[in-house]
Structure formats: C-alpha cells, structure tokens
Amino acid sequence: MEYYAQYLRGLREDHDLTQKDIARVLGTSQTMYARYERGANELPIRHLITLCQYYKVSADTVLGLDRKR
C-alpha cells in the first residue's frame, strides 16, 4: 500500500469524516475514494491538491517525502 493511502485514511479518521464526506469534497464517488485509500487506484494530482488545501497539509507530507530527509 502506498504511504499516501494510509496517511489519507488517518487524516480522514482524525477529522471524524467518512469516505463519503471526502468523496463529496473531491466530486467523486465513495467507491472511488475508497480505492484511493486502499491504494488500488492512484490519486490524481487534482485530488491531491484539493485534499492538501482541505486538510491544510503539504503534498510532501501526504506523499511521505518529508519523512525521507
């Protein structure tokens, strides 16, 4: 599983949100968002940007790039 998939699930759960809530923010279905969280589908850049703005975190954090420094 991709790091970002685990991180996104953790963010969502920390904010007491459902997959359906976040799917609405992204303009996608709950089923598709669940696939992003499982790592079954790659997260499109446009969704990454939207989620970073929504949660107020950097893309480096979501992608785990700041852990490798």
Language-model segments: what does each one mean?
Residues 40-50, 69:
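Short, basic-rich loop-to-helix N-cap that marks the start of a DNA-contacting helix
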Residues 13, 27, 38-40, 67:
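Residue-level detection of the helix-turn-helix DNA-binding "recognition helix"
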Residues 6-25, 50:
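Short basic helix-loop element that most often maps to the first helix and adjoining turn
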Residues 8, 22-23, 33-36, 62:
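Conserved hydrophobic/aromatic packing and binding residues within compact polymer-binding modules
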Residues 46-61:
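DNA major-groove recognition helix of helix-turn-helix/homeodomain DNA-binding modules
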Residues 14, 53, 63-69:
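Short, charged recognition helix plus adjacent turn
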